[in-house]
Amino acid sequence: MKYQRVKGTQDYGVEKAFLKDAVESLFLKEVRLHGFEYVELPTLEHAQLFRSTVAQSDIGNKEMYEFLDKSQRELCLRPEMTANFVRAFVQNKWHAASAENKYAYVGKVFRYERPQKGRYREFTQAGVEFVGKADFFKDLYVITLVLRLLAKLHIKYTLKLNYISNKETRKKYEETLHKYLLEYKDQLSESSQKRLETGNVFRVLDDKEDSQKDFVKNAPKLSDFYSEEDKEYVKNIKRGLDTYHGLEYQFDEQVVRGLDYYDDLVFEVSIKDSKAAQDVIIGGGRYSNLIKDLEGPETSSIGFAMGVDRVVDYLMDQEVYKEHLDKLETAHSENEYYFWAHPEASYKLNFFVWFFNLQLNEHISSSLLFDYDSPNRNKAFEKAKKLNSKAFVTLEEDNSLTVYDFKYGTKKDADLKEQYHHLDFTSLLDSRHFDNLFDSNLFKPSPKELMCMCSAFRNRFGDSKALLKFAKQFHYSEDDVYFSDQKIKKSKWKSAKS
């Protein structure tokens, strides 16, 4: 008998397996830089776990690999990893260690789907879970991790987000949506008609076929049902995302994600300009009831899962990985900087935005951690020391910035009130902690970025000698350096040298 691989599975040859390993290694490296700790979870679970958590989704209805073991227990191969993680989180009381918990995992997932390119019955997910009190800062933090991963993988992407509020708001909305869609029932696909009958009306919005129909696009909007608190949350998310120059994103009310436990913010990342049917490579969102529903503490979490196989397929097709594979293998980071903001600081959002932009700067490979939950500086300070951080960066109640340099045992202060509108390299420079906060050999700015930095440097200090010393940190010659739109004359360099 000639044996074939099981339908929906893959054989990874040497080259593809090597690339898959590189992608997973990069993922683990980046999540650890963001303070997430790696855990491993079992592939086998009790089937009831997923029946109770994703019952209304296609996963819970028809895609699970279920079976009875020899003791007649109903088991399954996990179809997704969030419920898998939450079960472990609750059972092992991981929540007892801290109010703020960040975890990462990589593992095989199994779904009985119709196989096609980008959709397999056995595939690998890499994901994170940031457990703790709901906070839009944490949402932005997780999104920065997603964007940094995409930059490291050299993937051009489309980021879509939506805010689906809480159960109470959605219930009111779904009643209105159900009434509206009933008028068009005959024009819906068979699967969407079943969703109407079972009360899973929300899923009609992201149905591949029906979502493209005009009457679905013109359906009542969930945003019309937002509370003032919901509107403020969305506003803060948009403010945070808008500060990152060059970031393109869309708020799309048809993005609802397919799992029952999501609420508040949801998002997905697809490959830009892709013609593939399965182009979503990352999906995630916040869930505020799942942990409690599985008999854990009443707390929230935000996370995402990356489809490793889809990423690998895309990189193989584009062959861009060949140019960057050595960077995936050799990228490393040594230093950690721990950030904390006083709860009452009026510039807390600005401080986080500064941190947010540093996180997304692909030239900075240092580990930057933000403490969201410590109520005072002393507790945050002890955490920073425990993590062997190189420096502790704080925003005080009066909006002053303080940098504690553990390596040299120094402390420096600066008032950043007037500098918060600078959100690129200039903000680093204006903080006057550039050489202490970041080692100059960690990155080399582009000429355009250097022009911006030199302009700010000259305006602030007016010192040619300091400017020359500053530029030489990045191994630039005199002819490379600009301020405003003019080259610095060599005569100035000569006078600065003397």
From Swiss-Prot:
Its EC number is 6.1.1.21. The keyword ATP-binding applies. It catalyses: tRNA(His) + L-histidine + ATP = L-histidyl-tRNA(His) + AMP + diphosphate + H(+). One of its GO terms (molecular function) is histidine-tRNA ligase activity. It is found in: Cytoplasm. The keyword GTP-binding does not apply. Signal peptide: none annotated. InterPro entries: aa-tRNA-synth_II (IPR006195), aa-tRNA-synth_II/BPL/LPL (IPR045864), His-tRNA-ligase (IPR015807), HisRS-like_core (IPR041715), HisRS/HisZ (IPR004516). GO terms for biological process: histidyl-tRNA aminoacylation. Pfam families: tRNA-synt_His. Keywords: Aminoacyl-tRNA synthetase, ATP-binding, Cytoplasm, Ligase, Nucleotide-binding, Protein biosynthesis. GO terms for cellular component: cytoplasm. Belongs to the class-II aminoacyl-tRNA synthetase family. This is Histidine--tRNA ligase. It comes from Mycoplasmopsis synoviae (strain 53).
